[in-house]
Amino acid sequence: MNWISVKDHLPTENGDYLVTIDGFDMYRYIKSVSWTNDLSKLNEWVFPAEEYKGVGGFYDFDGEFGDYEVSYVVAWCKAEPYEGE
């Protein structure tokens, strides 16, 4: 698994990723999220086309609040499927 800094580049393919996030409590943590190359196609109510058309971003879903953009990402890597037993 190779971590890539968001300063170097962002994903180019829609899909699931692991990200390292700078937390508000001065700690970094890892979270499983998704990436899309166009947030407006994901949910135009939350991500209106006027502001988000063609804009990529990491996002997640919350059962109470719905889709939301994941901020403060410092690094990412592709989430690979389990190849175990």
Regions found by a protein language model. Name each.
Residues 2-85:
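Secondary-structure transition motif
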